[in-house]
Amino acid sequence: MKNLFFTTCGYPHMELVAETMMHYALLGNEIIAVQCGQEIGQCLWNMDKNKWKCWLCNKHVNVFKRQMPANVKFVSLASLNNNDKWEEIKKIVFRYKTIEDIKKIEYNGINIGYGCVSTYVSKTRNLNPDVDLPYVRVYIDDFLHRLCYQTYLHEKIINAEKPDQIFFINGRISNARSLVEIAKKKNLEYVCVEGAKSVGGRMCIDNFYNNMPHNLQYRTALMENYWGDISVSRKEKEWLGNLFFSNKQNGKYYGDKNYVEGQVNNLLPDNWNNGNKRYVIFNSSEDEFFAIGDEYDKEKIFDTQIQGIKFIAQTLINRTNVDLYLRIHPNLKNIKYRYHTDLLKLSDEYKNITVISGDSKISSYDLMRGADKIIVFGSTMGVESAYSKKVVINLAGALYKYLNVTYNPKTKEDLCNLLTNDNLKPIDNKEGLLKYGYYFQRKNFISPIFFPLHYKQIKLFNKTIYLYKYCRILGSKFLYALINYFIEKQKGDIIPTEEKK
């Protein structure tokens, strides 16, 4: 089989692709590795277009290039340079008024807008940049032009090499999103390579076949397949599924930050025990799901979470026996943009809602345990609440949405009916919950599609630097870390962060 690997993703993501490439090369596959060669000049790692980051990235590629077996051939995008095409692309005029317009932008029938927006938002966490400011538009236009040129080069190399399968990181960010679209257009098999930290901090690599890792239907099918594996007993599946939820509620590490760390058990809002019914809203980090794809956009009833929360508060404003509590996601506590700061003002606008800030020590799990209804926007607190036999109303895309464990209204009218129904019961589907828990618990321990990613971390001038297997300069990891540290201090282009008023 002929595999085409795109290492054009910057540090540290290229390390995931390199390890995966080595794995398949040792199986005897014919491997073509595509390196950027400093040709594009902008990616998630280098949004400020710092030429020294490009230099270090190229050095990084050359390290693992020298260690690859003979059946791995490297091709550089720089070798495909076409100045005439680049000059032609730079003349393209993009017409957009909002970031939602940018999502829809295509080049030669290939969407480049989602990759642009996803990468920008991942870097800045700004969901609404002021594209009317001239220098903001110049920055975004330049990024879009680079993505057009990158797409041109990607198609050119795929057409030339005619691979059976292509590999790239994640599928969401700018270097890879167009590859998803190209693969679909050409009916070509593709693999999204993803990294994950499992229990105990072990870094591993997971592959997602012909789907992005965020695809809800695909992930549901994986959960069903894991559950249907007859090599594992039903008893063990149930034990592992229950263990996942038990560990989560006890603050055990599951690959992401521990967002309940520092929260105080039994600490609750002052008005918690006033005899009213308690409906608790857990919002999510809206920026994390903002530009994954149209699948998530279509799942939403409301354009923004704050619109949804206001709708809920207004719907229940005259039900004096119901108190609303909004727990702002801890990951938003340092965000200065209005999609977070406006949430903090909701108690001034609606008398029936108590806002609990992201940095509050109030216990999220105690809020969940004492709630009569839980409303979520796709967060894992939704499935955890369902496991605790709570009524859960989910208003966004979620990996548990198609497991039939939460109420998933499709319209505002559906939502109103769920909010005002005093006889609503929790959905009784323990097996669906255990499928979810077993999937993630098994992946964390014994998943056969995982293989380890070698890395260590060092402290340098109070900064933690992750050093992977191929992070070396002149054979030295320390020298790589030192150069990386000082390059990060160098200023490239200013990344615009102004929010539209």
Spans of features found by a protein language model:
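A donor-sugar binding/catalytic signature common to diverse glycosyltransferases
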Residues: 360-407
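Conserved nucleotide-sugar donor-interacting segment of glycosyltransferase catalytic cores
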Residues: 150-206
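Long, C-terminal catalytic modules of enzymes
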Residues: 275, 405, 409-501
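Conserved N-terminal ligand/cofactor-binding loop architecture of enzyme catalytic domains
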Residues: 29-148, 195-259, 455-461, 470-501
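Nucleotide-activated donor-binding/catalytic signature segment of Leloir-type glycosyltransferases, i.e.
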Residues: 341-358
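Histidine-anchored nucleotide/phosphate-binding helix
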Residues: 11-28, 32-33, 180, 301-317
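A short, glycine/small-residue-rich beta-strand->loop->alpha-helix junction that serves as a flexible
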Residues: 7-17, 168, 289-293
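Conserved catalytic-core segment of nucleotide-activated headgroup transferases in glycan assembly
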Residues: 248-344
